Amino acid sequence: MAADESSADTLRLQFKAMQELQHRRLQKQMEKKREKELSCQSKADNQEGFMVIPDGLSLLDTEEQNLKNIFEKRVLEDEIQHLRSELRETVDENGRLYKLLKERDFEIKHLKKKIEEDRFAFTGASGMAGDLVATKIVELSKKNRGLMAESESAKVRIKQLTNRIQELEHQLQMASAKPPSKGATDAGAKPLKTQTGDRALLETPEVKALQDRLAATNLKMSDLRNQIQSAKQELRVAQKVLANEVGEDVNIQQLLASPGTWRGRAQQILVLQSRVRDLEKQLGQRQNKPAGSSSSEVPLSSDSRKMTAQEKNLLRIRSLERDKQESWEKLASERDTLQTELEELRKKFEGMRSRNKVLSSEVKTLRSQMTTLVEKGRHDDELIDALMDQLKQLQDILSSLSVQEESRRTSQQHLDQKVNSEAQRSSSLVAQLRAMVADREAKVRQLELEIGQLSVQYLHGKGGGEGASPADARFPEDQTPITNSPASAGDHVGRLGSSRSVTSLGHTLVESALTRPSLPSPHGTSPRFSDSPEQKGWQAQAAEMKALWQAAEVERDRLNEFVTVLQKRVEESSSKLLEAERRLQEERQRAVLLEQHLEKMRLEPSRASVSQKTKNKPGPPAANTKPNSAGSAKKDSSSTQLCDMPMESQIQELNARLAIQMEENGILRDALGSALRGKEEDFRMYHQTLGQVKGVFLQALRQQKANKQ
């Protein structure tokens, strides 16, 4: 129905557009006609003026006639325009009504198709379904009747409008055929036309109100006419139905005046039909009677007549019984067929109901799956968007890190260049300082030699003044170098040590070596760089770096120890695991051997044969347990002990060992199950944490999107 409405709307719009185009064309044609008429009138006026002047010698009469002619022309033009506008309106209304008729016909066809489809769909339905179908059919028939009535009224209105159009066209033709000037016979009509023209020219609110009322009354009249036409059509239909029911040439007033009976016309028709059948049967029986019955005796004529009446009654009764029997048989067969059809329909209905249930359940499951898939797709889309955002962020971070790495590399290259330049400078400075130190040491040696010489001279001069002996003078002369030699040697050693410290620790300690006094001279050198703030700052930084380095070394040692301890623990646990696996294998092999031995002990008939077999037996287990020599030795010893024991004790021992092995196996299974359960719990917790993290992540993303929006 939505498609029909949309198509109807499009058709209406197209129809409106066509009407507008036609209206514009008509306006253009009317304007052209007006221009032509005005030009023709102007020419005719000029000719009449030229022609009237010589006939009528008075100019006033000619002017009055011209004015009257002009006024009449104007009135006629107004009437023509009014008639043309009415004609145009009626044409437009006629087109609209034709369009509405087409739409109604289309709706009627659509409804008929729908009714047929409903009939085909609900054929064979019984019970409530049949009632629903009947009610629906009744409603549709009512709607169809209403639409048919509307279509009939529209057709009647179209006929009226076509008649009106024809009348208006006729009036228009008559008005155009009228002469422009009239004689003295139309002298009485001229004042009326002038009055109508004056009224038309005057546009007052009262006139407008009256025109509106006139239009409303015209609309009401058209509606009433349509209703009257529809009522007339219904009356005609009713009369046709009565004529078909009662018969033609029957006075309805007499039927209304005559008292009615309880029997209707249909019942009377049935009674008459039954009487006709009876009469036909009687006629057939009379024709089939033998000719000998006519030659019967006269005295028995009354009895034969009586018998014929009885026979007639009997025949009639028998025929009625036959008819009843046939009708009963027909009804029974119809009932059977209807019952079979009803059973089939019930089966079909049950099948369809079960099918509908199955399909509804499938539809529900599919809808739930669709909803879950839609939710999953939405979550996946959100996750993909989040991952894409994260990927973009990581790409941005990677690009920034690459830029930082490039900048760090460039800065590292600059630092390396600076360090190399500083190292070259420091090496050149160290070489210069070494040269200076060597020069100063040479100067110091020269000064020491000069001081020694001066001291010797001083001692000589002092000895000469006091009158000392040359031996005494020699003694101190010899003594002074001896006494001074250790000092000079010590000073030399100190200088060597200072030079070594300079060479080993760089130019920072050269200054301290230079400021340190090399010998006990009377004028000592003052320290210049021993207490400088720069040196103190470098020393403090060096101490801090040293402390940090020591702490890092201690931490590294601790971590190494921790790693070694962990490695030891891992190795111990792995060794324990291997040992446990080896023991488990040994115990399994031992249990297998014990079971085999027990079976053989049960099968052996005597103790001697058992001992012989056990003596010959130890070969295969040793071959089976080649990888574990200790296990094979234990098994051999246990087997020899079992061989020495009696049968009952051997069986008890084997049962005890088997029970122990079963307990150990159960314990190992329990341990394995607990380990598996622990792993499963860990895996479950891992999945739960992942789900929680995913949920939190999605919630945060949704909040972020909501905040952005």
From Swiss-Prot:
<feature type="coiled-coil region">
    <location>
        <begin position="206"/>
        <end position="288"/>
    </location>
</feature>
<dbReference type="GO" id="GO:0006974">
    <property type="term" value="P:DNA damage response"/>
</dbReference>
<feature type="coiled-coil region">
    <location>
        <begin position="539"/>
        <end position="604"/>
    </location>
</feature>
<comment type="subunit">
    <text>Interacts with PCM1, CEP290 and PCNT.</text>
</comment>
<dbReference type="GO" id="GO:0034451">
    <property type="term" value="C:centriolar satellite"/>
</dbReference>
<feature type="region of interest" description="Disordered">
    <location>
        <begin position="600"/>
        <end position="641"/>
    </location>
</feature>
<keyword id="KW-0970">Cilium biogenesis/degradation</keyword>
<protein>
    <recommendedName>
        <fullName>Coiled-coil domain-containing protein 13</fullName>
    </recommendedName>
</protein>
<feature type="modified residue" description="Phosphoserine">
    <location>
        <position position="469"/>
    </location>
</feature>
<dbReference type="GO" id="GO:0042995">
    <property type="term" value="C:cell projection"/>
</dbReference>
<keyword id="KW-0597">Phosphoprotein</keyword>
<keyword id="KW-0966">Cell projection</keyword>
<keyword id="KW-0206">Cytoskeleton</keyword>
<comment type="function">
    <text>Required for primary cilia formation and promotes the localization of the ciliopathy protein BBS4 to both centriolar satellites and cilia.</text>
</comment>
<feature type="region of interest" description="Disordered">
    <location>
        <begin position="281"/>
        <end position="312"/>
    </location>
</feature>
<feature type="region of interest" description="Disordered">
    <location>
        <begin position="512"/>
        <end position="542"/>
    </location>
</feature>
<feature type="region of interest" description="Disordered">
    <location>
        <begin position="462"/>
        <end position="499"/>
    </location>
</feature>
<feature type="modified residue" description="Phosphoserine">
    <location>
        <position position="532"/>
    </location>
</feature>
<dbReference type="GO" id="GO:0031122">
    <property type="term" value="P:cytoplasmic microtubule organization"/>
</dbReference>
<feature type="coiled-coil region">
    <location>
        <begin position="323"/>
        <end position="457"/>
    </location>
</feature>
<feature type="modified residue" description="Phosphoserine">
    <location>
        <position position="258"/>
    </location>
</feature>
<feature type="compositionally biased region" description="Low complexity">
    <location>
        <begin position="293"/>
        <end position="302"/>
    </location>
</feature>
<dbReference type="GO" id="GO:0005737">
    <property type="term" value="C:cytoplasm"/>
</dbReference>
<keyword id="KW-0963">Cytoplasm</keyword>
<feature type="coiled-coil region">
    <location>
        <begin position="139"/>
        <end position="178"/>
    </location>
</feature>
<keyword id="KW-0175">Coiled coil</keyword>
<dbReference type="InterPro" id="IPR038929">
    <property type="entry name" value="CCDC13"/>
</dbReference>
<dbReference type="GO" id="GO:1905515">
    <property type="term" value="P:non-motile cilium assembly"/>
</dbReference>
<feature type="coiled-coil region">
    <location>
        <begin position="70"/>
        <end position="97"/>
    </location>
</feature>
